[in-house]
Amino acid sequence: MGIIASAVAFAALAAPSGASAAAAPSDVASGFWARSQIVWSVDQGWMGTLSDGRFRPGALATRAAAARVLAHANQRVNNVPFQPDAFTQAVTAGWITAGDGPRGAITQLEFDRAIVRILGIGSSARKLNTLRAADGWRPRLPRGFGAEQAVRQAGGRYNAPAGADDSETWPSSQLERTHLAVQAYQLGHLSGWWRSAVTNQEAVTSALPAYTPLKKQVLGFAIRYAGAPYIWGGTSASPQTLFGTRVQGGFDCSGFVWWVLKLQTYTLADGTTWSGDAQIAWRTTYDMSAHVPFAKRIARADLRPGDILFWSSNPKGRLTDSSTIYHTGIYLGNGWTINSHGSGAGVTLDYMGDGAGWFHDAFAFGWRVLPKGR
């Protein structure tokens, strides 16, 4: 299935240093996946507890609680004094709307758009929404595409561990208090180079080449799911049962490739159809790569849009040992890929050309399943 070990500007979802010094809320178990982030958020005053000391991790976050996190983030990023009436501050500043009032719920997308405003990356988000190919073709972008991509590049999102996949969020999901606490921690620990990561992302808006009719369908379909959560073992945008547990829709890296290139049938204007079902018979990243004959492995310089990509812990081009392959994605062209990975908290568009760090250095080879000329 595969997972990226590094690569982008995301604070690791590991135990925050010094977090153990503060006491955890009484209803946050010692083994809870976000315990350290909750402890940090409460200890730093970014979030609060009830009068009895409970945190209520599974409860929906209120707009007032979200505003409090945003006000602290604004203080951290922009050196603006924190205002106790954070809800009024957030509404007045235009970070969020009043909605159903301070006790109302807030969606992931509205919160992420507020982060975009506070970080001052609105122009990047708006530019990302102009994504188009060289011939003027524009894919149908998911709602909030620019904001969700920008926030991920900045480091404002996270990926829950496999055992907590039921807590992952789509942009339309209502935030729970656990999600809010983890994002508070992310915002309190942004990397020193998050601005350049977001600015560099803008280049994709003018990077896509002209596509054939089939590639417009295939890659347009893939882009439609940008922002979907990373779900270990996930192969569907709909709720799915994985390892005996019912979780929401989402994809791991090979699951996204499987969803786009194997499970779909694409119909062209002339009535002809195409599906990669017969060619892609292996579900995991390792199995996919292991069944690609050496003669069909594609070097970086020969990649074409729609090719399946593989990354390795010991890349040696077409001679890479498949046992070292641990990530996969789909090539968009001109050095860009669309892929689902934990470091990006789901499906993102990423640059893999010169200077791209891990995405460039760990690339092994590609595999072509789309028919030539289509």
Spans of model-derived segments:
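N-terminal capping segments
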Residues: 200-270, 322-324, 338
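Secretory targeting and sorting signals
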Residues: 1-21
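Low-complexity, Gly/Ser/Thr/Pro-rich intrinsically disordered linker/tail segments
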Residues: 359-374
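Glycine-rich, acidic and aromatic/proline-enriched surface loops and short helix-turn segments
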Residues: 40, 72-76, 116-121, 149-154, ...
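Active-site-proximal alpha-helical segments within enzyme catalytic domains
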Residues: 66-69, 111-118, 180-187, 250-263, ...
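Phosphate/pyrophosphate-binding loop motifs in nucleotide- or prenyl diphosphate-using proteins
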Residues: 45
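...with weaker cross-activation on analogous glycine-rich loops/strands in unrelated enzymes
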Residues: 216-219, 266-349
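Feature responds to low-complexity, polar/acidic, surface-exposed segments characteristic
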Residues: 15-35, 48-149, 158-177, 187-212, ...
